[in-house]
Each structure stands twice: as C-alpha cells, then as structure tokens.
C-alpha cells in the first residue's frame, strides 16, 4: 500500500471480495499492513459510517486515490435535509404585536437548547435601532418587527432569551449584533456559539496561523455545507428594511438567511471536535491492536504520549 496519503484525502479501498469502500484517510500502520479511514461508505449505495474503520493488507486488492474538484466543495448536507430546511424557511411566522402569537413564539424559543439569531438588522451597530430581530429553532423561524413593537418586544420576553444562559444562541459574527442590542436596546447578549469564530479556530488548526480575513455567512455555507453562493442575501436593502409594511421580499430573505445556521453550527462544532475524537480513537487502538509483546511494552509507558497521537490529532 502507498504511504503517501494525507489526512483527509479521499480514497477507495477495493477488497479481494470485490467490495468497494470510499472514505477519508485517517492513518496507516507503520508496517503498512493496515489502513484506517473515516467517513466511510460502501459504494454505490452505502450510508456514511461515523467511526474509523480499518482494512488489512490481507483483504485489500488495491487502494485508489480519488481526485476532488477544487471548485466543488464536499457536500455535507443531503438533498432531503436541504429541501427540508428550504420548506422551513418558507413557513416563517411574522410577528408585529405583543399578542398570543408573540408569547407562543417566546415559549417555543425558551424550550430549546439552541436557537439561531440573525445579524440582519444590526448592520449599523450602535448607530441605529434594529428594524427587526430574526430568531429560529431548528423547526420554526420567527421574524419580530422591532420597529413596530419597540421596547415592548424585549420587555415581553426577548431580552430574557438573549441575556440568558439558555437557550444558547447560534450566530455568525455577533459583533455588530451585540453592539446594537446593548447600546440601542439595553440587551446584553450572552451564551453565544459563533460560527465565524468556529471557522477561525478550524482554519488555525489546519494552517497553524490565523487567516487575514474572516469568512462571511455565505462563504461558510459554501465551504461547510456545499451550498451555492447565492443561497442567501447578505446585502439587504436598508431603505426597504425600514419601510412598513415590511415587504414579502425582505421577509423571505430574512428567513432564508437564518435557515441554515443550525445545521452550519452542527457541522462546524463537529469539525472543531474532530482532533479530539481522533485522539480518543488513537487511545482506544493504541494497546488493543498490538501483539502481546508490544502491548506489554506499551503498558509500561502509560506516562508517555502514544507515538501515533500527534499524527492522529492533525487535520
């Protein structure tokens, strides 16, 4: 077997039984008798396996490197999930008064472990109040018309949600959102999972140094979910955003802009945790996969880091 594979490289393992398994390179035994892959699926119709799978030289016919297009990102969202999220984005609830619908929305949001918070409407930071606030669960999007409800919206439940430890808020670049909420609406945003920060950490772990620029929400949706760049509208018309009644076009854009944030956060969180999971897998295999003599030797070195560990936790 070739030993010039890089971590994450897409490979196909062809077995002597004529089965084909496709996955990403994880590691190889020093004597090249075993290759390990993750994100493995059986070709052509198998589902992806979450764990690390091992293939031995005695069962392998050949290992094939697959070329991936540099233009097309690896799609990490199924067509079914994509269509499901689009349906959710079209069934948003627009709220412009503190009534039964408002309180039902607040109750629904409070029952969640995570909610998404859109930065749309806070583009000017502390220079002006937010015309709207968009929050969502993983199944329902709510557009609150702050321009109409004013401070009543925050006093009636939104402030408590945004300032509370729970639910945790998912945002992409919360800087201006936090600034606007604090200086214009007396709301101190707390307990945030920021997907832009997550992307920076992943990039630093992969490239050692931080990038010069941050990625927009659209860029992250393309990088992590494989979505088209024009899936969302990142440049909402400021004038139209303050006109009332709020146009259907603006409301549709607001809903679509937040719709994929939950799934994006899951993918980014999973990728941030990847070195940890690989490190644990290394520990699981370290002694177990050794012969008796080697296992005895390793048991006497438990105060040392396994030789394979550093390679295992690299992206």
From Swiss-Prot:
MF annotations from Gene Ontology: protein homodimerization activity; RNA binding
Q: What is its main location?
A: cytoplasm
The subcellular localization recorded is:
Cytoplasm
Q: Name one GO biological process term.
A: meiotic cell cycle
List, for all copies, the residue spans of the domain called 3'-5' exonuclease: 141-228
Keyword Cytoplasm part of the UniProt annotation: yes
Identify the InterPro entries for this entry: 3'-5'_exonuclease_dom (IPR002562), piRNA_biogenesis_EXD1 (IPR052144), RNaseH-like_sf (IPR012337), RNaseH_sf (IPR036397)
UniProt keywords, alphabetically = Cytoplasm, Meiosis, RNA-binding, RNA-mediated gene silencing
| Keyword Cytoplasm appears in the UniProt entry | yes
Segments forming a coiled coil: none
Q: Mind naming one GO cellular-component term on file for this protein?
A: P granule
Q: Which PANTHER family match?
A: PIRNA BIOGENESIS PROTEIN EXD1
Q: Describe its assembly.
A: Homodimer. Component of the PET complex, at least composed of EXD1, SIWI, TDRD12 and piRNAs.
Q: Fill in the domain comment.
A: The 3'-5' exonuclease domain lacks the conserved Asp-Glu-Asp-Asp (DEDD) residues that coordinates divalent ions essential for exonuclease activity.
The free-text function statement in the UniProt record for this protein reads: RNA-binding component of the PET complex, a multiprotein complex required for the processing of piRNAs during spermatogenesis. The piRNA metabolic process mediates the repression of transposable elements during meiosis by forming complexes composed of piRNAs and Piwi proteins and governs the methylation and subsequent repression of transposable elements, preventing their mobilization, which is essential for the germline integrity. The PET complex is required during the secondary piRNAs metabolic process for the PIWIL2 slicing-triggered loading of PIWIL4 piRNAs.
What family is this? Belongs to the EXD1 family.
The protein here is known as piRNA biogenesis protein EXD1
The gene it comes from is: EXD1
């Amino acid at each position: 077997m070739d030993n010039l594979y890089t971590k994450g490289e897409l490979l196909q393992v062809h077995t002597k039984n004529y089965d084909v398994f496709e996955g990403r390179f994880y590691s190889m035994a020093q004597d090249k008798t075993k290759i390990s892959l993750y994100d493995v699926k059986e070709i052509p119709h198998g589902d992806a396996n979450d764990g690390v799978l091992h293939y031995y030289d005695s069962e392998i016919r050949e290992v094939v490197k697959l070329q991936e297009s540099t233009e097309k990102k690896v799609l990490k969202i199924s067509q079914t999930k994509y269509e499901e999220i689009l349906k959710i984005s079209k069934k948003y609830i627009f709220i412009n008064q503190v009534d039964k619908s408002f309180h039902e929305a607040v109750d629904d949001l409070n029952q969640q472990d995570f909610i998404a918070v859109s930065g749309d409407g806070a583009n000017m930071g502390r220079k002006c109040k937010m015309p709207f606030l968009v929050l969502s669960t993983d199944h329902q999007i709510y557009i609150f018309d702050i321009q109409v409800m004013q401070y009543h919206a925050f006093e009636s439940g939104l402030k408590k949600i945004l300032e509370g430890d729970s639910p945790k808020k998912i945002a992409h670049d919360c800087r201006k959102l936090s600034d606007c909420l604090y200086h214009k609406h007396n709301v101190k945003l707390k307990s945030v999972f920021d997907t832009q920060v997550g992307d920076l950490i992943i990039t630093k772990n992969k490239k050692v140094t931080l990038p010069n620029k941050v990625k927009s929400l659209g860029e992250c949706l393309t990088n992590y979910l494989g979505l088209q760049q024009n899936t969302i509208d990142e440049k909402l018309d400021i004038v139209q955003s303050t006109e009332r009644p709020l146009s259907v076009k603006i409301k549709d854009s607001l809903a679509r802009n937040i719709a994929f944030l939950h799934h994006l956060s899951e993918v980014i969180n999973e990728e941030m945790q990847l070195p940890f999971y690989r490190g644990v897998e290394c520990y699981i295999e370290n002694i177990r996969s050794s012969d008796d003599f080697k296992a005895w030797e390793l048991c006497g070195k438990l105060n040392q880091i396994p030789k394979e560990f550093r390679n295992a936790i690299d992206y």
